Design a protein with these regions (language model features):
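Feature marks short, surface-exposed loop/turn motifs that line or immediately flank catalytic pockets
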Residues: 13, 63-65, 104
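Short, surface-exposed ligand-recognition loops at beta-strand->loop->(often short) alpha-helix junctions
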Residues: 12-22
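Short glycine-enriched loop/turn motifs at secondary-structure junctions
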Residues: 3, 49-53
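Long, low-complexity, Ser/Thr/Gly/Pro-rich intrinsically disordered segments that act as flexible linkers
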Residues: 96-105
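Active-site-flanking beta-strand signature of metal-NTP-handling nucleotidyl enzymes
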Residues: 2-10
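Pocket-edge positions in alpha/beta enzyme catalytic cores
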Residues: 11, 56-59
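An amphipathic, aromatic/His-enriched active-site/gating alpha helix that lines ligand/cofactor pockets
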Residues: 25-42, 50-51, 58-97
Length: 105
């Protein structure tokens, strides 16, 4: 069953481009160390009717087991911990969360 996993964060004022750059860096350096295919990853940014600071990263997964395997894998990558500290400097603390959607059509 195909699903969309979407990670949300809000950039601190004046740091949105830096947060986006760090997210792209994560895709290239850390995401590629996982078994997920990040070629179809999309990054969305708040515009009309959404918070301007909002950034969302979404990618397709086969199911919740694949997402859990992904979480387990990134937890074991030292570079992910270091990246998280840098990302924490440019995003609003407590603003990150995940959503998962089923693809129905």
């Amino acid at each position: 069953m195909s699903m969309i996993a979407r990670w949300h964060f809000q950039a601190k004022f004046g740091h949105k481009q830096e947060a986006i750059a760090l997210s792209k860096e994560w895709d290239e350096q850390i995401g590629k160390q996982t078994d997920l295919d990040f070629d179809g990853t999309r990054m969305l940014s708040g515009s009309v009717g959404a918070k301007e600071a909002e950034v969302q990263v979404e990618f397709e997964i086969d199911g919740l087991d694949e997402l859990q395997t992904f979480f387990d894998k990134i937890a074991s990558i030292k570079m992910h911990e270091d990246w998280g500290k840098r990302m924490g400097e440019v995003i609003v603390s407590g603003s990150t969360y995940w959503e998962v959607f089923r693809i129905v059509d």
